[in-house]
Amino acid sequence: MIKVCHISSAHPPFDVRIFHKECISLVKAGYDVSLVVTHDKHETVQGVKMIPLPPTKGRIHRMVIKTHFAFYRALKTKSKIYHFHDPELMIAGILLKIMGKKVVFDSHENVSSQIENKSWIGNKPVRLLVKNCYRLFEKFAILFYDTVVSVTPEI
């Protein structure tokens, strides 16, 4: 049985798209599915093995510390395919690919355009710089992935 591991550091454990549409569909198709996600316990729900991540303690925690937890917990599944859902996991996706794994990046939103509206990033020139750096890194990172799934054509 082929093992697939979905990874999210930002979405709720029973997200409609990730858990209900993608993970459960894979289970029904005969795959061994794990989901590394913020959750309170190890359990199997509708055939999906839930691998818990600790609750987020702010943006920096989620983007730096939680991504490390997610990467190492995902590795422990020893899956053949890794499907991640959050841009802060792009480096983990590159590392997984370097390790010979199949990697899918599921881009749910247009992050570079959202950066323009995130006041916590700084003033407008700083946001423009961050946006352009993100775009460059994203273009570099997707060269490593086997597949990129997007919800709209502009992504």
Model-derived features: positions:
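Extreme N-terminal starter segment of soluble prokaryotic enzymes
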Residues: 1-5
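Short N-terminal targeting/anchoring amphipathic segment
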Residues: 73-90, 101-104
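Short, hinge-like loop/turn segments at secondary-structure boundaries
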Residues: 49-53, 100, 121-125
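A short, histidine- and acid-enriched strand-loop-helix "catalytic/donor-clamping" loop
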Residues: 13-15, 79, 105-124, 147
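N-terminal strand-loop element at the rim of the active site
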Residues: 6-65, 154-155
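Membrane-proximal helix-turn-helix segments that form the acceptor-binding/catalytic region
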Residues: 68-75, 95-99, 105, 111, ...
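Alpha-helix/helix-capping structural signal
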Residues: 88, 153-154
